[in-house]
Amino acid sequence: MDAIKKKMLAMKMEKENALDRAEQVEQKLRDCECNKNKVEEDLNNLQKKFAILENDFDSINEQLLDANTKLEASEKKNAEIESETAGLQRRIQLLEEDLERSEERLQSATEKLEEASKAADESERGRKVLESRSLADDERLDGLEAQLKEAKYIAEDAERKFDEAARKLAITEVDLERAEARLEAAEAKILELEEELKVVGNNMKSLEISEQEASQREDSYEETIRDLTQRLKDAENRASEAERTVSKLQKEVDRLEDELLAEKERYKATSDELDSTFAELAGY
């Protein structure tokens, strides 16, 4: 009877120990489940951060491409402006040369007109001298008349030359007015071009500043890209580590579940044995 009681006490203690071990296993299982959930949550957070980093990386790449496109457009615009400026400077030079030639023609016509005027004055003086001498010397009248006719011819010729010179002068004046008008237009265009050049200079300065800023932003983007790439690698490493940790925890959970199942089976066997023992005692 004492042996049976000792056996019952031993079985009871074994049962209590089995219950304690089962509770410990269940606690470990709950802890593992909690750790597993935490790791899975960390893994989800890392995956979200990884997606955000990928979006930031794509956005920065798009901004960098846009900055490069704007820089190429500004450089092309500067080249077009420089080409147009060179063409306008060439046109101004041609207008100045045309004006110089017009001034030379005007000066030549003026000199010819002065020569014709001097010849007419000389003829007029000769005619007056001949008229005054005709009263005193009748014998020289025929000669003087001949000289007068010649003088008239010279005067008429000079008059024709004067008219021709006047006509050429009028043409020259028209050419001069046109040249002056072209010169005024050219001067106005020069002023306009100077203003445009000032604006272009300011724009070029702004573009240089923008280019420097774009270069700085590009350096910053490259640094950001390197940082994001490193962070991406770190995130991938952490994700891999988290996956390995989850795998280990899953194995531990499986092991603890197996232990719990074994403890439950041992508990069931102990309970069945106690029930059988109690039934035998009740039979006595």
UniProtKB/Swiss-Prot annotation:
Keywords of the record: Allergen, Coiled coil, Repeat
This protein's record includes keyword Methyltransferase: no
Coiled-coil parts of chain: 1-284
SUPFAM superfamilies: Tropomyosin (SSF57997)
Complex and partners: Homodimer.
Recorded domain comment: The molecule is in a coiled coil structure that is formed by 2 polypeptide chains. The sequence exhibits a prominent seven-residues periodicity.
Recorded family membership: Belongs to the tropomyosin family.
The protein's name: Tropomyosin
Species this chain originates from: Cornu aspersum
